[in-house]
Curated annotation (Swiss-Prot):
Necessary cofactors: Mn(2+)
Main location (coarse class): cytoplasm
Protein name: Phosphopentomutase
Lipid biosynthesis keyword on record: no
Binding annotation for Mn(2+) 2: D286, H291, H339
Family: Belongs to the phosphopentomutase family.
Cellular localization per UniProt: Cytoplasm
Gene: deoB
GO CC entries: cytosol
Primary enzyme class: isomerase
Length: 394
């Protein structure tokens, strides 16, 4: 008999809670995502996360300890060697990743692009982090006139290739992206995904078409999600979860437009009758505020998210478990634009915890979540991770 019928896992993308012991190796000494945001805001107002025990993990400005937290609390240390979204999420579901995915804030190395030009017979323009729509305004006309390829990236581990459908036929663009995918399997260029970005229209009026195609990497091993799906449990992926795992182990995928849309979809799944997990990623924290180094926007987004939690609490049943965590840090006052190597919070709550919660021991890997989920549903345990299921007392 499963202890919990439904587990709701929420990943607050990039919400770190202070530098990890190995932060120095990543150039991240002193990083502290929530702590620095709380200072910037002169106190964060997150009463619902505080009730769950956020301030019991660590007190910060506006976030204090409570006498009787509703849930169990601790922080987790990442074991894998990367600090990107895919590594963090894959580890949460039981994998250990020793090859970090690369990000290219200065553009891609010349050797990689030379090889791509040679293999495709087309010149490359762009080669920088850019917004997909702005890059067309800047380089779309040149691409049409020269037949070159617009190559660009973002703050994530991606290589994107844009070309006009009437200049580079779709099939050729897809073939080019497959070549780029092969080249970026090399450790020094390892990107999480290569994306074909076809567009149409005239200079001054370009639009991206729905013919986008992603060449992602599947997780390097079976995750707890695969085990759940193969045992006929539901795995409902909300937000970019299905993309992060390239659809592996997902039984239903719900797309989201924003954090608030993500919270709406979470409430929708709370109203559904299922047995298994609902897995939500709230990406705005990272994409809109962390990379853009906007502590004010980040703080407001955290408060906006916190204000939605009562709806979640209200709908949770006695045999439900809510797990809230993060996948890495992205301190908006830290130098640069990259993620930061930090501990992440872990909060566990069920309405069946009548006595309230207490501190769990420090988790040595994010995979402890995957192990806990696996034990609850009695599926094959991941190679990595230690379950804390039995520490959660009803």
């Amino acid at each position: 008999m499963n202890k919990y019928k439904r587990i709701f896992l929420v990943v607050m993308d990039s919400v770190g809670i202070g530098e990890a012991p190995d932060a120095e190796q990543f150039g991240d000494l002193g990083s502290d995502t929530i702590g620095h945001i709380a200072e910037h805001m002169n106190g964060l107002h997150m009463p619902n996360m505080v009730k769950l025990g956020l301030g019991n993990i660590r007190e910060m400005k506006g976030i204090s300890k409570v006498e009787k937290p509703l849930g169990y609390y601790t922080k987790m240390q990442e074991k894998s060697t990367g600090k990107d979204t895919m590594t963090g999420h894959w580890e949460i579901m039981g994998l250990y990743i020793d090859t970090p995915f690369q990000v290219f804030p200065e553009g891609f190395p010349k050797e990689l692009l030379d090889e791509l030009e040679e293999k495709t017979g087309r010149k490359i323009i762009g080669n920088k982090p850019a917004s997909g729509t702005e890059v067309l305004v800047e380089l779309g006309q040149e691409q049409m006139e020269t037949g070159s390829l617009i190559v660009y990236t973002s703050a994530d581990s991606v290589l994107q290739i844009a070309a006009h459908e009437e200049v580079v036929p779709l099939e050729e663009l897809y073939k080019i992206c497959k070549i780029a995918r092969e080249l970026t399997l090399d450790e020094k260029y390892m990107v999480g995904r290569v994306i074909a970005r076809p567009f149409v229209g005239e200079p001054g009026n370009f639009t991206r078409t729905p013919n986008r195609h992603d060449y992602a990497l599947k997780p390097f091993g079976r995750t707890v999600m695969n085990e759940l799906k193969d045992s006929d449990y539901d795995v409902i992926a909300i937000g970019k979860i299905a993309d992060i795992y390239d659809g592996e182990g997902v039984t239903e995928s719900l797309r989201t437009k924003s954090n608030m849309d993500g919270m709406d979809k979470l409430v929708d799944t709370l109203n559904m009758d299922f047995t298994g997990i609902s897995f939500l990623n709230l990406v705005d924290f990272d994409a809109l505020f962390g990379h853009r180094r906007d502590p004010q926007g980040y703080g407001e987004a955290l408060q906006e998210y916190d204000a939605r939690l009562p709806e979640v609490f209200e709908k949770l049943k006695e045999d439900d478990l809510l797990l809230i965590t993060a996948d890495h840090g992205n301190d908006p006052v830290h130098p640069g634009t990259d993620h930061t190597r930090e501990y992440v919070p872990l909060l566990a709550y069920s309405p069946s915890m009548k006595e309230g919660g207490q501190e769990l021991s420090l988790r040595q890997t994010f995979a402890d979540i995957g192990a806990t989920v696996a034990e609850n549903f009695n599926v094959k345990m991941p190679e990595h991770g230690t379950s804390f299921l039995n520490e959660l007392k009803k």
